[in-house]
Amino acid sequence: DRNETITMAMESTTKIMTCILVLENAKVDETVSVSAYAATMPKVKLYVKCGEHYTVRELLFSLMLESHNDTAVVLGEYIGGKLLGETGEISEHTGEESKAALHRFAQAMNEKAEEIGCEDTWFITPNGLDATETLTLSDGSTLEREHHTTAKDLAEILRYCMKTSPQRDLFLEITGTQDYSFTENGRFFQCHNHNAFLPVSYT
């Protein structure tokens, strides 16, 4: 189908890749702190606050059931920081440090996309909010890239998450959960599954 290779904005389907990368790079019982930058994300969000702590599991349910933009950034920043060799609290990040960690996470997203066979996909953010970036090529020229994918590549990503990834069972457990609630930082949170973008036929 010709439409399979037309580029399109990813929006919330970005969070599928964010989820699987987090599962492959962290344990769900690890505790993550919130940076000032992550707390500024627009709706839809969990309303995390700078300095709060959550488990990776809690954040993943928030991410995949409610598609929260702030939790995507908390998780992306955490994994990006780990990949950069950071050992300190994410909550202590300056704005520039947050962006550097998120840039490293986006690199990991693009590396994974290439690894699983995506042909026309480019990640810039962990939450799918529209973004562009300017890349400097080896010859000194520049290239404008947008956050995008195709239907064909998205199918490859879903297939990997549900069938091939070593963390597929956890991915399916999270995305197949209808309701999840938790209490952290003196607040009660309830997440309901709105995941229309995960077709049953892939499971």
Give the residues covered by each predicted segment.
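Short, well-structured active-site flanking segments
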Residues: 24-38, 166-176
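Active-site SXXK
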Residues: 9-33, 154
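Envelope-exposed proteins and targeting segments
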Residues: 6, 28-30, 42-44, 116-119, ...
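Substrate-binding clefts and substrate-entry loops adjacent to catalytic sites
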Residues: 25, 39-47, 70-88, 95
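Penicillin-recognizing serine hydrolase domain
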Residues: 59, 77-202
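Signal peptide-directed extracytoplasmic domains
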Residues: 39-61, 65
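A mature extracytoplasmic/lumenal domain signature
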Residues: 14, 36-38, 50-52, 67, ...
